[in-house]
Amino acid sequence: MVIVMAADASVVDIEHVVDVVHEAGGEAFVSRGGAAPIIGLSGDIDRFAATLNLTGLPGVATVVRTTAPYKLVSREHRRERSVVRVAGVPIGPDTLTVIAGPCAVETPEQTLAAAKMARAGGASLLRGGAFKPRSSPYAFQGLGEVGLKILADVRAETGLPIVTEVIDARDVELVSTYADMLQVGTRNMQNFPLLQAVGAAGKPVMLKRGMSATIEEWLMAAEYIAQRGNLDIVLCERGIRTFEKATRNTLDISAVPVAQRLSHLPVIVDPSHSGGRRDLVLPLSRAAIAVGADGIIIDVHPHPETALCDGPQALIDSDLRELASIATHLSPLVGRTLTPAPAPAVGSRA
């Protein structure tokens, strides 16, 4: 059950609803992120519906019984699709948002060069990994806080807000001091303590689909974040593991419209990790835009041959010029506008 509060509901109204539910033996979880606060209920829902006059409480707009196991992220209670804003940059149904940058932050020079390439390629958000969960314990694990500081310096230079991954619940507070958006990667999609921690952090969250996860499992993971009060969640389809060996992963392009039908959350696509090869990134980007994705997230590197992480899939300048052309020309055909990048800082060389 979900209680939708009126847009002008006061803090006192919300707290009163929570108290009523608690006194009845249930749990109430307040989420903010849309036009009105939403309160998700758990417990004896049938008894609550029969004995509690929830619709009569001050500030309550409506009460919705949901059949989906994911209550707060479901389209059952929020019919219109959500828009998530990352430092003012929108991700939602009317725009195409390009997120680009290096898979891993290596040096200040490499990160700044990649950010300038990303901006020239139509990106409005900068991705970059400071903490890297790798399949091999011997692979480059990221620069940690040093990498976060590099990203912050590059943001100041280029004006691009930061999207970066957090891999441990203990690091959420640290990463949140630098990041504009927190990313939960495929390997951590069901790391429930991490999901709860990012849900309480007060930052927008990008949730990548687990490499072997069903769409329902993906949405249930998003529910963990929403239940902690954060509905500013963007879902990212990044390819799933199948028997196919010709590509790094298999892009489940059908997951985009399915997830958009089931959930009000924005859905973007990662063509870089799906294909794992530079020559596949642009074709998969076209497919993502055509199917109605709300954005794409792309790996960029000024010198892919020396990259410490995922060089074979990173785009270079010529690819980015083509990507900018693709995004500019395809966006209007699917009823969208390309999200512009924020203005760079005064005096910067971006």
Predicted regions and their residues:
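Active-site mouth loops of central-metabolism enzymes
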Residues: D8, L41, L96-A113, S136-G142, ...
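Alpha-helix-loop-beta-strand connector modules within alpha/beta enzyme cores
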Residues: F140-T164, A197-P204, I253-V267, Q313-R336
